[in-house]
Amino acid sequence: MEQVSENVIVYYPGDPIGDEASGTVKIALVGSSSYDPSGVHDWERKFIEGVKYYADRSMNSKTGLVMFKNLNYSILCGKAANPMQNPQMDPNNPEFITKMSSNLDFCDAADGIIFNFLKKSQSPTPLMLFGHLVKTGKMICKCPQEYFSYPLVKLMCERYQVPLYPGKMVSVLLMLQGLFTLPAFQQVQQFNLPE
């Protein structure tokens, strides 16, 4: 667990979700991951930094965005803080079991799931996890059209009414706003207009 700001806590595979997460908006980050040392494709870290920026800024009444005001976030990051020493998909590989179990646990506990496919990913694991989560009603998806299974992802998103964001012009702010279309986030915000 890592406290990245007053309003944002990050959990990684193997971290138990403790009492400090109660009363927070829980966002699971799952999908393709990259351990490229340059960090160019580290979308999870970029998302965490973006949430930190908007959460911290929302504390300021002059510059904050109303929809993020007074919210605390728990980011349930499916990417291990360090690359797995043994990334083999094997039921006897404890690192693989911990990562996959954490991904499933994080998604179960989350109010919203951001599922991201990296353009060059060829791993079958994110696609399998996507198929498992697509019907949850609490997911939004980012998938570039160049992804090898984009037609399947698009079809599943349309069928189960999952918001799909293609392309590289998708920002953290746009993804956060997309989460607020989900029922759990609408309940958290309780934006009820008087009748």
Q: What residues fall within each predicted segment?
A:
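Conserved catalytic or regulatory cores that recognize and/or transform ribose-phosphate-containing ligands
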Residues: M1-E195
